[in-house]
Amino acid sequence: MADSISDLQKDTFYWQRLLRLAGYYHGAIDGIPGNGTRNGTERWSTDADRYKMETGCFDERTERNISTLLPEAQKAARQWFKLARNEAVNQGYEAKIICGTRTYAEQNDLYRQRPKVTNARGGQSWHNFGLAWDFGIFQ
């Protein structure tokens, strides 16, 4: 038996946790993709698509990052970003959502960066739970 789990299992564990947090998955968090995981993923996608239809589509990078958030956070991010983007454009700038959900490993990598970019380690950031996004303003 292997000492570590596969990347697929790690990804599935992570996805099952997010699905459970969003209320779309009630099975065991076991890293095994099954019907419960698939059904939860379909419900997630249905809600995400509905929120996208309500606000319209944004640029590719923003869409990619919004799609990593919990569906209710996607809704909030879309509503907020629509206003922020319009204000940025009115002032001659461009706005993008540059980050959404991060894994614990990604969060720890940011935590170790110098100069310091975050005070949160993996598991301590709202990004790790699909509830936060970062944005950038560009010329």
Language model features with spans:
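Charged, low-complexity surface segments at secondary-structure and domain boundaries
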Residues: M1-A2, Q139
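Short acidic, glycine/serine/threonine-rich helix-capping segments at coil-helix boundaries
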Residues: D3-T62
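Cell-envelope/glycan interface and biosynthesis
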Residues: D47-Q139
